[in-house]
Amino acid sequence: QALCQFQPYCLDGHCATYQIERFTTVLADRKASTADRALALRLLIHMLGDIHQPLHTSDNNDRGGNSVKVRLYTGKRQYSLHEVMDTVLIKQLIGSQRLDTYANQLKTTYQPQFSRWLVGSPKEWAAQSHVLATQQVYRQLPEFTCGIAPKTTLTLSESYVYVAKTYLPEQMAKAGVRMAYILNSTLK
């Protein structure tokens, strides 16, 4: 039921949102060792990215989509749903472009929304990603049942892939803008 009824959990601080706060504090501490601050920076960047990938903020008794086997409508290769959202569609979006070119495209497209995206906290941002997972990533799957991972390989329709390719770039842009904001305010 975690997917259908979002219940934020953070058992003993073992969650990304708590760790983001922790790593931000270490990074801001000028008395912390260089090694500790460098590790905090690496992990902060990783965790901030993770909370913007919807399947990192949700679970349908399927290990965040890792147990859901899917195929794209264009092929026969089998992937996990998590892999499709984390890697396959992102690579398709970027294509043969250089990463900095794609990043500049995201900036140009989404810049008018940047200030609005800075409202809230990592907990709220993770909750927003969870809603996206609930309403789009999972609920739009063929044969979706809340709380039950599919037993068969699902084919992701052209429509499903098209819609995913509309929200994934925005999630990447949000992650980048929020990361820049946190780093700039922490390291000023």
What are these regions (language model features)?
Residues Q1-M47, P54-K188:
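N-terminal, motif-rich segments that launch catalysis or mediate targeting to/interaction with membranes
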